[in-house]
Amino acid sequence: MGSVTVRYFCYGCLFTSATWTVLLFVYFNFSEVTQPLKNVPVKGSGPHGPSPKKFYPRFTRGPSRVLEPQFKANKIDDVIDSRVEDPEEGHLKFSSELGMIFNERDQELRDLGYQKHAFNMLISDRLGYHRDVPDTRNAACKEKFYPPDLPAASVVICFYNEAFSALLRTVHSVIDRTPAHLLHEIILVDDDSDFDDLKGELDEYVQKYLPGKIKVIRNTKREGLIRGRMIGAAHATGEVLVFLDSHCEVNVMWLQPLLAAIREDRHTVVCPVIDIISADTLAYSSSPVVRGGFNWGLHFKWDLVPLSELGRAEGATAPIKSPTMAGGLFAMNRQYFHELGQYDSGMDIWGGENLEISFRIWMCGGKLFIIPCSRVGHIFRKRRPYGSPEGQDTMTHNSLRLAHVWLDEYKEQYFSLRPDLKTKSYGNISERVELRKKLGCKSFKWYLDNVYPEMQISGSHAKPQQPIFVNRGPKRPKVLQRGRLYHLQTNKCLVAQGRPSQKGGLVVLKACDYSDPNQIWIYNEEHELVLNSLLCLDMSETRSSDPPRLMKCHGSGGSQQWTFGKNNRLYQVSVGQCLRAVDPLGQKGSVAMAICDGSSSQQWHLEG
């Protein structure tokens, strides 16, 4: 009797275990499908404790198979194979097809993103708030060690009508890649944004998932980046201020090199190397080490690093003296920021403030360096998606204030280019002139002689020509394939409608001519399609309904980045669509972009 009881007891245990196994399997495998279509972070752990880890797209279900059963109906067997999340890390692996359009809603979101933000919001939302970025530092930087007693930083991020996902990815990149003891706080300054998700939804997210170290400051009217940063600095209590734009992603060990330089000399202001995040694909890529300069139109520009700056004992890790800063990303001692006069509060919104603070740093006893071992990615947009509240030309207004306070007699160099501005009003500058006297600042001639001797001067102030460092341009990308581009359904070739050298010309399908070199395409390692070694196949990022055209190769990917899929599709990365024959049986041979569906009209083959 006892053995029977034991046997049935064991059967019961086995049945119960099997039941729980099935229930847990169902729960963990299908819970994602039941999530609503909004941001639903799943908690994980990081250097600052629990944090939201996983992200579900807010407006579109995106390319995941489990969320898009219609993919099978569309016969797309290889949809975003590389878009997977590591179950341990919760980080999305980047795919060139992350921006693929699957339906009209995706198309609307993509087009709206370019209109509102001037970058691909569809990809931004699909990426979520966490992702790995490539470590773009020089190998020597990875061998450096930093003192344990570095000062803690307040990170100030001003934003106006920023994409929600881009803003939170900026914030989470700082949290994910900064030691907790070095991150005193993050201050978000909302410059009176119009978008609803940047109001209550942002507050709710911060309170729920980022309590403690995040402060959200709300401006009651549009102040602009300049005064917005001053407001953020006024609320900061960390020893060091770090200013970041609202569409950045910091890299590995980004903060320690900046803090170490400031710890060594509190009058040193430092900038990271700014890596490139493509506005079209959000791909993160390394930038060369360059330094800031300017021209007499008072516009910032990038300069090659002079040989005199490259021969230091520290080698590739040595700080690089920079005459100016780009302005979006820099760090300085908080007390020194206030001692030096913060920003010119008479400047409006944006423009010129980076040159003004650069001149003031150098002329008033400070130093400005770029730190090669610190890297931060930044979305470089082709246009500003918003203007000034009243439509005023803030760049001109701010440049005039800068010229009259800091350039001394050299302001005539500016007015020689803009004589129309000599009598234009620029407001009261007496406070800034008095600040210059109080700080005992040097002359602008001293700045040109000692900080930026490479700057050329015309007229009576002309000085001997400085050595010019010639940039011979990038090396041509490696050719991967060369041949005719066949449309498999029609057995025709993609060619120029007119001359292959005609910039802006359309491409069409015509009968293949094996003796015609003008039908030869090159596909290179930059994923460019180059016809007859002359022009690249290009798409408009903002008007995806436009047909592809031949344009000068710009080497920046995006609108000229094409990939060949497993189903012989030809996918355009920035548009998120595939190339198709409009009327395969017709005579015109027109081609256009369309949602990728695996149909025969979208099948291509590049010979070679």
UniProtKB/Swiss-Prot annotation:
- UniProt record similarity statement: Belongs to the glycosyltransferase 2 family. GalNAc-T subfamily.
Pathway field: Protein modification; protein glycosylation
An annotated GO BP: Notch receptor processing
- Give the first-level EC class, as a single word: transferase
Notes concerning its domains: There are two conserved domains in the glycosyltransferase region: the N-terminal domain (domain A, also called GT1 motif), which is probably involved in manganese coordination and substrate binding and the C-terminal domain (domain B, also called Gal/GalNAc-T motif), which is probably involved in catalytic reaction and UDP-Gal binding. The ricin B-type lectin domain binds to GalNAc and contributes to the glycopeptide specificity.
* Alphabetically ordered keywords of this record: Disulfide bond, Glycoprotein, Glycosyltransferase, Golgi apparatus, Heterotaxy, Lectin, Manganese, Membrane, Metal-binding, Notch signaling pathway, Phosphoprotein, Signal-anchor, Transferase, Transmembrane, Transmembrane helix
Topology class, membrane: Single-pass type II membrane protein
This protein's source sits in the domain of life called: Eukaryota
Cytoplasmic-side positions: 1-6
Query: Which reaction(s) are listed as its catalytic activity?
Result: L-seryl-[protein] + UDP-N-acetyl-alpha-D-galactosamine = a 3-O-[N-acetyl-alpha-D-galactosaminyl]-L-seryl-[protein] + UDP + H(+); L-threonyl-[protein] + UDP-N-acetyl-alpha-D-galactosamine = a 3-O-[N-acetyl-alpha-D-galactosaminyl]-L-threonyl-[protein] + UDP + H(+)
Q: What does this protein do?
A: Polypeptide N-acetylgalactosaminyltransferase that catalyzes the initiation of protein O-linked glycosylation and is involved in left/right asymmetry by mediating O-glycosylation of NOTCH1. O-glycosylation of NOTCH1 promotes activation of NOTCH1, modulating the balance between motile and immotile (sensory) cilia at the left-right organiser (LRO). Polypeptide N-acetylgalactosaminyltransferases catalyze the transfer of an N-acetyl-D-galactosamine residue to a serine or threonine residue on the protein receptor. Displays the same enzyme activity toward MUC1, MUC4, and EA2 than GALNT1.
Q: What is its EC number?
A: 2.4.1.41
Q: Which disease is it linked to?
A: Defects in GALNT11 may be a cause of heterotaxy, a congenital heart disease resulting from abnormalities in left-right (LR) body patterning.
Segments crossing the lipid bilayer: 7-29
Cell compartments where the protein resides: Golgi apparatus membrane
Pfam families documented for this protein: Glycos_transf_2, Ricin_B_lectin
Summed up, the tissue specificity of this protein is: Highly expressed in kidney. Expressed at intermediate level in brain, heart and skeletal muscle. Weakly expressed other tissues. In kidney, it is strongly expressed in tubules but not expressed in glomeruli.
Q: How does this protein assemble?
A: Interacts with NOTCH1.
Look up the record and report any one GO term of the cellular component aspect: Golgi apparatus
GO terms for molecular function, please?
carbohydrate binding; metal ion binding; Notch binding; polypeptide N-acetylgalactosaminyltransferase activity
Q: Which residues bind Mn(2+)?
A: D245, H247, H378
Q: Where is this region: Catalytic subdomain A?
A: 150-261
Query: Where are the annotated segments for Catalytic subdomain B?
Result: 319-381
Q: What is this protein called?
A: Polypeptide N-acetylgalactosaminyltransferase 11
What positions does the record give for glycosylation? Answer: N428
What positions are modified (Phosphoserine)? S95
